[in-house]
């Protein structure tokens, strides 16, 4: 068997509406009917038991090795967790030559699946070893590397549900929605009309606070500092406890909250300095951490974020309890899973030390131990959906903050006791405004129901009835 002329069909095609890998497969006369190859099917199934039946029940036609290649390529992707269902094999006008078409969800994964399928078929033909788990692991790892993240993926899924065509413009998260003059573009949760100036403002936390304060939105007081001594001076001006963080950081990196001593502040300053030279000290706002998602002029989702923590059982150390929590299949090392693994870094060690613990401590049964004081999902926190609980005045403040910065998709971080009451009544405030906010806490919260945030974003980009398509009468070529 020779597999040639492999190419990707990146849209609706002669065979189906699915994206697919198409190849021309040349078989020998014997390979035109695998039933004539002694022991082939048994050897193949011994190596890959999950492969589909070569023919539906009741069909007696001979099956070519090209057809087996098709089924193996599809089955390997399915076993690796890729959502694929379509494949077909069609003979050509040339004897022993077939067109094999196999759906893919990610182009690179489709190509690799075809390569592994050819190796598996040859292994069964020549009775040589084949490592199925290595093949599946390679496909899974590649799929995780190249597939769209949850934020971009949710927007693309919403577009597909609306009949809006899409194509990836880069190997990253930049995607084209629609065709020609009707097209729009996204990169993660950021649209093509997002202002570069608005994004720059959102990255500058101190400037953002000045704008929000001028608009009457409650924010914590604070200022930029140049060194540890200046940071302590700022803390004295503001009043302890304080928060120290990079002025243009993200995902909670380098953030230390609830600092009550000079020693803690110096350590926090050093941690923040590792991420950015410009460091901000601001008043610590006690309360819960909420993320409100604004799209256009609407609040579309809200979640309470809780810091990463473990609960003692009186037997295991904190390090062992963290390992147990990280074993949850929902937790991963990136943003492709609904939760992120808790990691032991300097901030985690400092947080433990402030509670009188270290990694080898054994907390009492039922005792809660925080690994961080900030609640970002990217550092191992969890999320609870609270969209239905948001007070109208809190929603109005979040929308006003997004508009003041100029963002059309905006993640507004609020700290307060409860979002059931206005911020001013409880001394709460808006602590950050984020461009390109992560959506996974709203799509798959740890607790509560997921929200259709991808649909909300697509709805803001394409009016009802619009599909981003241009009518095509015919396609010709030579």
Regions from the language model: what does each represent?
Residues 167-168, 280-282, 411:
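A structural signal for short, well-ordered beta-strand segments and their strand-loop junctions
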Residues 1-160, 298-301, 306-313, 317-320, ...:
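ATP-dependent carboxylate activation and anion-phosphoryl transfer catalytic cores
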Residues 178, 234-235, 293, 421-425:
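Short glycine-biased active-site loop of nucleotidyltransferases that positions the nucleotide triphosphate
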Residues 184-343, 392-396:
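Active-site nucleotide/adenylate-binding loops and adjacent lid/helix of ATP-dependent enzymes
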